[in-house]
C-alpha cells in the first residue's frame, strides 16, 4: 500500500468499526482502492479488519451497483451559462470546465465573482468521495468572498467523478501519486491563465484526501503562494521545508490519526521562512468542515473559514 491507500483504508476501517459503514461497502472499497480482491483482503488485514469473508460475500460486495436515475457528478459539456473551456473566458458565474491535461482531459468547476475585476485564484481539492455538490458549493462561497475558485476533479483520468462514491474513491486510491501531482500542477497553470485571476501565484485548499494533495501541491508547484490543508496527511514531511507557500494547516483535536502529524508539520513549516501556522480545533473530528456529514462542527467550521479567508487575502 502507498501512503494514500493506507490513509483511505484506515479511514474506512474506522467507519466500519463505528458501524457507519457496512462490511459489504468496506469490502467493495478495499478491492477498488487496491485493484484486486487479494490485494483488497490483504489491505483489510493490514488495518485490522481482516475476516473470514465467504467467496459469495466477496462476489456480492464487488459487484458494481445497479444503475439509477441519479445524475453523474462528472463534468458535462459547457452550457451557455457555463465557464468555457478556454482560460480566456469572460463568462461570469459558475460552470463546468474541461481542458487538456498531462494524461487526460481534466475536469473541474469554476466560480467567479459576479463583478468583473482582478481576483486571487484558489484551487479547491475535494474529499475522497470525488468532486460533488458540496465541493462546488465551497467554490461558490469563495466567489462570493471575492476569489476566482476552481474545484478540481482528481478523478478526471477515470472519466470524472460519478454518483458512485466508492468508485470515485477507488479511482483516487489506485491512481499513481505522481499522476495526481502532475494534474494538480496542470490545474495551477490553468487557473493562472483564467481571465481575471491575479498574476503572481494562487492559493490551494482541500479536505481529507484533498488536504494531503494540498501539501503535495505546496511542495511541487511554485505557483502556489498560499496553502490551507484541512485534516490532510503530509506524505513528504522531509520535503515540506522546501515549500515556497505560506501554509495554514488545520486539524481537529479528535482526529488522532491525522492530527498526530501536526507537531512534525509545524516544525518543518517553521524552516520555510514563509508565514505558517498550525491550528487545532478542540472538540472537532475529521471532516468537521463538511456541513453535509455527521462530523460537522459548526463553530469550528465557521472559525476555520474566517481564518482561511484571512490567510488567502494576506498571502495570495
Regions found by a protein language model. Give the residues of each.
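Serine-hydrolase catalytic machinery in alpha/beta-hydrolase-like enzymes
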Residues: 15, 22-32, 58-70, 88, ...
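N-terminal secretory signal peptides
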Residues: 1-25, 45-47
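Bacterial lipoprotein signal-peptidase II cleavage site
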Residues: 48-59
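Primarily recognizes the serine-hydrolase "nucleophile elbow" in alpha/beta-hydrolase
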Residues: 186-243
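Conserved alpha/beta-hydrolase "acid-adjacent" motif
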Residues: 256-262
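C-terminal catalytic histidine-bearing segment of alpha/beta-hydrolase fold enzymes
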Residues: 275-316
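Short beta-strand/loop motif that positions the catalytic acidic residue
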Residues: 249-251
Amino acid at each position: 500500500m502507498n501512503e494514500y491507500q493506507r490513509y483511505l483504508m484506515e479511514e474506512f476501517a474506522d467507519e466500519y468499526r463505528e458501524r457507519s459503514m457496512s462490511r459489504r461497502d468496506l469490502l467493495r472499497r478495499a478491492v477498488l482502492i487496491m485493484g484486486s480482491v487479494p490485494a483488497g483482503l490483504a489491505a483489510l488485514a493490514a488495518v485490522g479488519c481482516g475476516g473470514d469473508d465467504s467467496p459469495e460475500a466477496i462476489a456480492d460486495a464487488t459487484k458494481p451497483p445497479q444503475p439509477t436515475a441519479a445524475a453523474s457528478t462528472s463534468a458535462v459539456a459547457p452550457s451557455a451559462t457555463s465557464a468555457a473551456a478556454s482560460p480566456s473566458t469572460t463568462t461570469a458565474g459558475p460552470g463546468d470546465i474541461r481542458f487538456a491535461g498531462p494524461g487526460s482531459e481534466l475536469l473541474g468547476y469554476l466560480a467567479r465573482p459576479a463583478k468583473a475585476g482582478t481576483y486571487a485564484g484558489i484551487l479547491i481539492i475535494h474529499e475522497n468521495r470525488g468532486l460533488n455538490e458540496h465541493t462546488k458549493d465551497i467554490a461558490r462561497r469563495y466567489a462570493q468572498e471575492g476569489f476566482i475558485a476552481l474545484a478540481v476533479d482528481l478523478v478526471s483520468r477515470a472519466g470524472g467523478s460519478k454518483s458512485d462514491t466508492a468508485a470515485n474513491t477507488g479511482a483516487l486510491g489506485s491512481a499513481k501519486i505522481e499522476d495526481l501531482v502532475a494534474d494538480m500542477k496542470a490545474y495551477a497553470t490553468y487557473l493562472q491563465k483564467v481571465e481575471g485571476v491575479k498574476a503572481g501565484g494562487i492559493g490551494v485548499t482541500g479536505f481529507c484526501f484533498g488536504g494531503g494533495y494540498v501539501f503535495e501541491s505546496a511542495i511541487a508547484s511554485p505557483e502556489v503562494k498560499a496553502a490551507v490543508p484541512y485534516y490532510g496527511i503530509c506524505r513528504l514531511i522531509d520535503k515540506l521545508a522546501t515549500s515556497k507557500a505560506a501554509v495554514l494547516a488545520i486539524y481537529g483535536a479528535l482526529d488522532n490519526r491525522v492530527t498526530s502529524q501536526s507537531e512534525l508539520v509545524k516544525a518543518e513549516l517553521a524552516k520555510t521562512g514563509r508565514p505558517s501556522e498550525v491550528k487545532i480545533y478542540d472538540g472537532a473530528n475529521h471532516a468537521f468542515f463538511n456541513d453535509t456529514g455527521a462530523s460537522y462542527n459548526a463553530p469550528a467550521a465557521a472559525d476555520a473559514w474566517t481564518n482561511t479567508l484571512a490567510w488567502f487575502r494576506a498571502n495570495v
